[in-house]
Amino acid sequence: MASRRLLSSLLRSSSRRSVSKSPISNINPKLSSSSPSSKSRASPYGYLLTRAAEYATSAAAAAPPQPPPAKPEGGKGGGKITDEFTGKGAIGQVCQVIGAVVDVRFDEGLPPILTSLEVLDHSIRLVLEVAQHMGEGMVRTIAMDGTEGLVRGQRVLNTGSPITVPVGRANPWTYHEVIGEPIDERGDIKTSHFLPIHREAPAFVDQATEQQILVTGIKVVDLLAPYQRGGKIGLFGGAGVGKTVLIMELINNVAKAHGGFSVFAGVGERTREGNDLYREMIESGVIKLGDKQADSKCALVYGQMNEPPGARARVGLTGLTVAEHFRDAEGQDVLLFIDNIFRFTQANSEVSALLGRIPSAVGYQPTLATDLGGLQERITTTKKGSITSVQAIYVPADDLTDPAPATTFAHLDATTVLSRQISELGIYPAVDPLDSTSRMLSPHILGEEHYNTARGVQKVLQNYKNLQDIIAILGMDELSEDDKLTVARARKIQRFLSQPFHVAEVFTGAPGKYVELKESITSFQGVLDGKYDDLPEQSFYMVGGIDEVIAKADKIAKESAS
């Protein structure tokens, strides 16, 4: 502005020194509208000076005052603040949108970290979670859904609380997403119970420290790799080995034997797999629709693979919050499935990168152990009930030393390994009895009888595995009598570990079997002692207890005799 005023004064002084007929001797507004044929344009020099003087004088004029920007309705900063600590009710404005990261400015009522914000005047319900305070009233948030259509200046409401989700036996609510919105198009969720997804783990004085077995009714699990009530179990299995069927049978058995409820959290699930699981649960009766929906045994919470990282990073907490309600409010033994726990870590790694944090080893977030610990420590047994978690685990490049699975292993109480080799033999569930482990397999917890039987079964199976190379090369005839007896018992045990499932009745036509733990111990101990050496190994295949083995052997004998 000062330079333009200087130019203006120089031009005026130049005009005073020029001849009286000079075009700039009488500068006035009319000059700007004079025609090109005017006498004042006889000299090109005079024309240029005229334009320069006109620009300088007009630019030097003070700009007219602009009206102040209109404030949002509802008072200073917009919105009526009802809580001074959380800023609940304050209205902010979107300042920047970069993918899943949204920056919001608040004149007052700054929301704390992890507070849920809701975008107003948007086509969908878009929830933002505060992740960082940037200063000067600016917060950086992570979106729980797509940010398409979001624009700068759009209003954002501070809800004053973390993300809350509906809990309880709402009707209908079986199938919903990270923020509690139903996605099965069966109507709105009707409930008055909501809980925040960010909660503290139960206090130590409220936890039940006594170690107890959660009986599943599945022989191979209860005998060789028992689940701890309130423990964490890692489920390893590739595609097509029966992982989904095992999950559904666990849900069914826990509901029938313990009256418990199950929650399935699909973290980074393929949409197709999630839909298949939903349909199969409806067909098997685990999920009931219509008038019988209150009798459903399972709730599904999905943050699918195509969702933004914020949704995938929080859907595990949503499922856990639903499970916590059934544990604490209804005193139930809840079964929580998380598929896949690696996707939870992966999503938090993406969020960390979006927030500009320096990555740790192998590109993971520096808060890897904290993020995973915050989830795992809430999965525990209290004096009211328990949450037993079965978590599918993906191991990147089969590297067990990768930070993500290595950190997860530290929290596990048991591992259930599904083997493709066993499934190829037609033995279901295809649980590997030698690779599956449990911290509960101790005589101090299980008792001497259970422990000795389990170790005896594993010893026979391991000896059989060691003899398989010799059998393949030389044949059974070259084995000693003791080895032949070991092989015969091992093959019977291997088939006796199979079991018909209730949820597979529609496929196999065989009724499902629930086997009590005591019966499993007695039956397998009898096989180890040689009480059933005279029975054919076919009679041990796909049955429940030992009584069914004897009945099946008699039936086979009668058919052979006839």
Curated annotation (Swiss-Prot):
tRNA processing listed as a keyword: no
Annotated positions binding ATP: 237-244
BP terms from Gene Ontology: proton motive force-driven mitochondrial ATP synthesis
Entry-linked PROSITE patterns: ATPASE_ALPHA_BETA
Gene3D superfamilies attached to this UniProt entry: 2.40.10.170, ATP synthase, F1 beta subunit, Bovine Mitochondrial F1-atpase, Atp Synthase Beta Chain, Chain D, domain 3, P-loop containing nucleotide triphosphate hydrolases
First and last residues of the transit peptide: 1-55
InterPro entries linked: AAA+_ATPase (IPR003593), ATP-synt_VA_C (IPR055190), ATP_synt_F1_beta_sf (IPR042079), ATP_synth_F1_beta_su (IPR020971), ATP_synth_F1_bsu (IPR005722), ATPase_a/bsu_AS (IPR020003), ATPase_alpha/beta_chains (IPR050053), ATPase_F1/V1/A1_a/bsu_N (IPR004100)
Keywords tagged on the record: ATP synthesis, ATP-binding, CF(1), Hydrogen ion transport, Ion transport, Membrane, Mitochondrion, Mitochondrion inner membrane, Nucleotide-binding, Transit peptide, Translocase, Transport
Primary location: mitochondrion
Cellular component aspect of the GO annotation: mitochondrial inner membrane; proton-transporting ATP synthase complex
Entry annotated with the keyword Plastid: no
EC code(s) of this entry: 7.1.2.2
Pfam family, one: Synthase_beta
SUPFAM superfamilies registered for this protein in UniProt: C-terminal domain of alpha and beta subunits of F1 ATP synthase, N-terminal domain of alpha and beta subunits of F1 ATP synthase, P-loop containing nucleoside triphosphate hydrolases
Reactions listed under catalytic activity: ATP + H2O + 4 H(+)(in) = ADP + phosphate + 5 H(+)(out)
Region: Disordered, residue numbers: 1-43, 58-83
Biased composition (Low complexity): 1-13, 20-40
Membership in a protein family: Belongs to the ATPase alpha/beta chains family.
Function: Mitochondrial membrane ATP synthase (F(1)F(0) ATP synthase or Complex V) produces ATP from ADP in the presence of a proton gradient across the membrane which is generated by electron transport complexes of the respiratory chain. F-type ATPases consist of two structural domains, F(1) - containing the extramembraneous catalytic core, and F(0) - containing the membrane proton channel, linked together by a central stalk and a peripheral stalk. During catalysis, ATP synthesis in the catalytic domain of F(1) is coupled via a rotary mechanism of the central stalk subunits to proton translocation.
UniProt xrefs under PANTHER family: ATP SYNTHASE, ATP SYNTHASE SUBUNIT BETA-1, MITOCHONDRIAL-RELATED
Subunit annotation: F-type ATPases have 2 components, CF(1) - the catalytic core - and CF(0) - the membrane proton channel. CF(1) has five subunits: alpha(3), beta(3), gamma(1), delta(1), epsilon(1). CF(0) has three main subunits: a, b and c.
Protein name from the UniProt record: ATP synthase subunit beta, mitochondrial
Organism: Hevea brasiliensis (Para rubber tree)
